[in-house]
């Protein structure tokens, strides 16, 4: 890790690292890009306000935030706009759209066996050092991998080309500029990259870019988001009776020994107009979660608050955090405690959780050094606004020949969204659900230019596409599952998002 000394340039502007430090890093020939950061005081701004400005400036933008289970706000909020590249892949057709400084776009299309090779090339091209004073994300690829991305890591798994509103298997945008709220230091950090191959000229360009970003935040026009309006009732695709039939079929496969557990989901849809941004505002206030996100792009708008990490790779340590076993929150502290005790004694929930911890160990073990896979935390009750879950932590040290793309391949989709054994569970999901899952059960987050990864499981979210919103939730089916209870579990998991939509419709101050 490199020390990012601060230097003051014209007007007392705080900027780091120094030009001399950047020169030294460039001379190592190890890095292609060195992050440059400028600080502003944050007391005049909020992430929501800045997001309004960025959305007015660019249709392609994002906001990533976090809060712990104790509802303590996370240290950083990350925002980005005007990506210089978008990489999408659908049924092995890879598209790369680049945008230059003048706004001119160019698109290339090619067929690929696996999009991961292209992602590795891009990350190598922008290889960036980890800087001591910098936040964990200073630029990289931000977006989603859909549930159906599994077709690239498991080519023998046959997924039908069914409707799911033409969802892409992968949609990642390259952001060289990042705006970071450091809530602990009460600073806004503006970050862009300096190219090592043209250092002096690139440094001057970066300083100018940071000034443009500062002016945009200070003086930019705010987006007036159109309020969300439902044009029809939110309805589940599978009514209780149909979902019960699916559960019984899944239990048949369990009795036959095909699987131990499978997660069956139920999408809820409605026609809608307007934006999901106010829905995100409600979620971040009413359902603070480790992963809160808002995305806007050409074809989709997305808002959510996920409790569960899919995969996190930081300085060589790979982690996953399976959540399995659910109870609703109690209305009183006493009722909440009773529900917790019942959860910890429920043999069905404990068996399901143990299976998924084992699956997490297996997934991480695929690409970790022998003897490094550990269960760091086991059977802890994690509380959220509407539900509580049993949670564990599994870690491993990634092998030298593996990387962040391999981590996505190894773990996506999570066992908590598929089942065990995973391959056969995915086949049964394909048979019983009769539709592509799209983003549900996939991954949302970033792969950075330093080789790190932080992604959540795509749950507790709503997306809007082609004039329709969709919320999807699932339940883990085991041998003694009661169909009606599993249907209700789907409803419980969707409740926080449905209530956020209803509140957003009523209007926010």
Predicted regions and their residues:
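Extended alpha-helical targeting/anchoring segments
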Residues: 11-509
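Short, Lys/Arg-enriched N-terminal segments with co-localized hydrophobic residues
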Residues: 1-14
């Amino acid at each position: 890790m490199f020390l990012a000394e601060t230097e003051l340039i014209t007007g007392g502007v705080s900027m780091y690292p120094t030009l001399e430090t950047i020169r030294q890093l460039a001379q190592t020939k190890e890095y292609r890009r060195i992050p440059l950061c400028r600080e502003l005081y944050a007391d005049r701004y909020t992430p929501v306000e800045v997001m309004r400005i960025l959305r007015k400036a660019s249709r392609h933008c994002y906001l990533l935030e976090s809060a712990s289970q104790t509802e303590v706000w996370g240290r950083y909020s990350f925002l980005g706009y005007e990506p210089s590249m978008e990489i999408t892949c659908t049924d092995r057709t890879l598209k790369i759209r680049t945008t230059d400084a003048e706004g001119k776009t160019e698109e290339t299309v090619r067929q690929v066996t696996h999009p991961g090779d292209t992602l590795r090339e891009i990350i190598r091209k922008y290889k960036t050092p980890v800087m001591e004073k910098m936040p964990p994300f200073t630029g990289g690829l931000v977006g989603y991998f859909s549930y159906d991305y599994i077709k690239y890591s498991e080519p023998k798994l046959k997924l039908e080309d069914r409707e799911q509103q033409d969802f892409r298997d992968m949609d990642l945008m390259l952001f060289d500029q990042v705006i970071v709220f450091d809530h602990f230091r009460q600073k806004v950090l503006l970050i862009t990259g300096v190219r090592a191959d043209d250092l002096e000229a690139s440094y001057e360009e970066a300083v100018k870019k940071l000034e443009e970003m500062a002016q945009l935040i200070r003086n930019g026009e705010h987006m007036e988001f159109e309020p969300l309006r439902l044009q029809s009732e939110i309805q589940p695709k599978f009514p209780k009776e149909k979902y019960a039939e699916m559960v019984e079929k899944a239990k048949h496969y369990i009795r036959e020994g095909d699987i131990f557990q499978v997660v069956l989901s139920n999408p809820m849809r409605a026609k809608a107009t307007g934006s999901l941004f106010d829905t995100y505002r409600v979620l971040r206030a009413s359902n603070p979660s480790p992963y809160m996100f808002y995305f806007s792009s050409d074809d989709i708008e997305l808002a959510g608050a996920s409790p569960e990490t899919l995969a996190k790779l930081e300085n060589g340590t790979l982690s996953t955090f399976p959540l399995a076993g659910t109870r609703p929150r109690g209305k009183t502290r006493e009722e909440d405690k009773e529900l917790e005790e019942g959860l910890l004694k429920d043999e069905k929930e404990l068996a399901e959780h143990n299976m998924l911890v084992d699956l997490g160990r297996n997934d991480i073990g695929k690409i970790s050094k022998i003897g490094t896979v550990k269960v760091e935390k086991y059977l802890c009750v994690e509380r959220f606004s509407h539900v509580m879950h049993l949670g564990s932590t599994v870690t491993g040290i990634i092998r030298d020949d593996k990387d962040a793309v391999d981590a996505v391949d190894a773990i996506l989709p999570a066992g908590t969204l598929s089942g065990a054994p995973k391959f056969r569970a995915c086949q049964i999901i394909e048979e019983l659900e009769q539709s592509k899952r799209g983003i549900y059960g996939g991954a949302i987050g970033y792969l950075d230019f330093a080789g790190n990864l932080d992604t959540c499981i795509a749950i507790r979210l709503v997306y809007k596409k082609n004039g329709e919103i969709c919320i999807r939730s699932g339940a883990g089916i085991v041998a003694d599952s009661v169909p009606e209870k599993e249907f209700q579990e789907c409803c419980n998991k969707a409740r926080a998002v449905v209530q956020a939509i209803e509140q957003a419709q009523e209007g926010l101050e």
